[in-house]
Regions:
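Membrane-embedded alpha-helical signal segments
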Residues: 1-306
Length: 309
């Protein structure tokens, strides 16, 4: 089966409701992809279905226990249409799983490759997307680059969801907002724009939203790549973003009205805008008496001047 791409390199088309045709299309898209699990099954005798997900990025036990098994055990007294079946499943079977509907192949494929599960039903032009993400990740460990004597020892990981939770744990305020989007034409990397709704400058927030939206790059694999694509003056010797692997430092930046960018697969976040004096602050400064912390900053600044001289 021929896969049709548009000028923007996105797969065109939507589900047709013909199970054989739709399933064959997805099989063709995922040809030679050994990590894609395609699990066709029958809901009694009158409806075929299939669950499709990425092995290693999806909670397979959740798919089996809360999706496939309940559907196979469900007793149907009479034959119903695909749309009626979809509605019944959403209202009575998927009570313990977050889900949404999708119909375009572009959205469906993005969801599958993000770790969600596609439930394809015969006779239905819409599919159910189940939230079953379970990325492999390391646990929260001790910071390696910004070590402190006093203060928290935890650090960000490569899992963006863990990183946003570490920030939310420190700022339990409903005005803390996290806008999620994807960047990278091919990598489709998750990115979060994090800010305090009542403290951030609206014009700065809108500017960052627009810049993130206009990123045109095939693969985004780390926050450093985002930093290079967003900075205004590429020739400036001074950093325009501050990178940190400390959740408490990111939280402090948010409470100062700054914006934090969290990128999936990156063991740190970006704080912006960055000022010159921010790079002379240490993590310990937040947990030390003001006089002592200020004196330490003056010493660091003086030492930097001597080093340059």
């Amino acid at each position: 089966m021929k896969i049709v791409y548009g000028r923007d390199q996105k797969i065109k088309g939507s589900l047709t409701g013909d199970f054989d045709k739709d399933y064959a299309f997805l099989e063709a898209v995922f040809e030679r992809s050994g990590d894609i699990v395609k699990n066709p099954f029958c809901i009694v005798d009158f409806c075929r279905a299939a669950a499709i997900y990425v092995d290693g990025m999806t909670d397979a036990d959740m798919v089996e226990d809360f999706v496939i098994r309940p559907l196979l055990k469900q007793k149907w007294e009479e034959k119903i249409s695909g749309r009626e079946l979809l509605s019944y499943i959403e209202n009575h079977v998927m009570e313990t799983v977050d889900w949404k509907e999708d119909e375009t192949f572009e959205d469906i494929l993005t969801d599958i490759l993000s770790g969600n599960t596609l439930l394809l039903l015969e006779g239905c032009k819409k599919a159910i997307i189940l939230s079953t993400k379970k990325y492999p990740s390391r646990g929260v460990g001790e910071t390696q680059q910004e070590m402190v004597i006093r203060g928290p020892k935890d650090s960000f990981t490569e899992n963006m969801r863990i990183n946003t939770a570490l920030i939310r744990r420190r700022i339990r305020d409903p005005r803390l907002k996290m806008e999620h989007t994807m960047t990278g034409e091919r990598s489709k990397t998750d990115l979060a724009i994090i800010y305090m709704e009542d403290l951030v400058r609206p014009e700065l927030l809108e500017k960052i939203r627009e810049k993130v939206k206009n990123i045109s790059f095939d693969g985004i694999f780390d926050g450093g790549m985002v930093e290079q694509l967003l900075e205004e003056n590429a020739w400036s010797p001074f950093p325009q973003f501050q990178h940190t692997e400390r959740p408490d430092k990111a939280a402090s930046g948010l409470l100062e009205g700054r914006i934090v960018l969290a990128v999936d697969n990156s063991p740190g976040v970006l704080i912006l805008p960055a000022t010159y004096q921010m790079f002379f602050q240490a993590g310990d400064d937040y947990y030390t008496r003001f006089e002592v912390a200020s004196f330490a900053r003056v010493l660091r600044f003086a030492a930097s001047l001597f080093a340059i001289g």
